[in-house]
Amino acid sequence: MARSSGSSGGISVDRFSVVLVAVAATLWASDAYFRNQLITHLTPTQIVVAEDGLITLFLLPVLIRSVHELRNLGWKGWLAVVIIAAGAQSLATILFTASFQQAATYKVFAETFVLQQTQPLIAIVLAWIVLGERRRPWFWPAVVVAMVGVYLVVFAQDPTAPVSALQQGRVEVGLLALGAALLWASGTVLGRFALGSISFWSMTSLRFTLALPLLVTIVVVQYGTGAFSHYQFSDFVPNLLAIALVPGLLALLLYYRALSRTPASLATIAEMAYPVAATFIASAPPPWGFNQPIYGVQLVGTALLIGVIVLLNLTKERVAEVSATSTLKLAES
């Protein structure tokens, strides 16, 4: 059994580890610039499979060198890694894209985005069930402040949009968005679980390597023998290469390095930097963004989220020394 995260057990959260999770989440949003130049002739799945293939190629030497380390993963650890690869890396993106496309058809975009904001709540519940994480009472008001901050950023133009969208919402749009949120949230918790037995390098390598066969299969099923005929050399240099290196490889290495020393319930709050960063990137002029206006309330919301992330980073929380081969239980921090 893992040691208690009380005063005498566990590992102290690294300085700036929560902030580093937020930085990684911000890097995820940077793919918008490069992705915008690909979506005219490639589908989201085709973009994801090419990105995954490049990163797998980059990390193959790392995976080969760390084969001995993979023996530390018990069946629970392997199950966690497979769920991350198949769910968070593969199916979640497909579900979210499908939800967005359905929302576009019925003009209920806000339904997709507001239900996506359930992800941190799902992750906190899963961290409690899977890892046994317990947070102090002050944590919950901080969560509320962070979610209010993100809400102000995402729905600045019309704060009532989620209410009307949900009232006129479509069941299929909501289920797809919730499915993506569940898979991404489980990726955070199970990633923290697996990192108890393997390094962040190995975790990153396994995530992309195990996801690649599934993604290739999905693309072939969707588009048949011509699934890979739409790629051009100009797609790979610089766009797909940049997506693979920055929001892909660099962001995930940084994310798993920070997650290895951060409770999952704290990391999921820091991940909320992603929709905030994506919103501000969208405000950039073309071709970098969509020239969307910036509202004063968005600056307020951003300040609230940054304040919560800094607060979480300054706390004296401790992370239990977990192992993917053991029963996990975290005492109250």
Would you name each region that the model predicts?
Residues 25-26, 47-50, 109-118, 190-213, ...:
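Helix-helix packing/entry segments at the starts of transmembrane helices
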Residues 2-7, 138, 236, 272-333:
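C-terminal-most transmembrane helix of multi-pass membrane proteins
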Residues 38, 47, 51, 99, ...:
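Hydrophobic/aromatic residues within transmembrane alpha-helices
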Residues 13-17, 41-45, 49, 73-79, ...:
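Juxtamembrane helix-entry segments on the extracytoplasmic side of multipass membrane proteins
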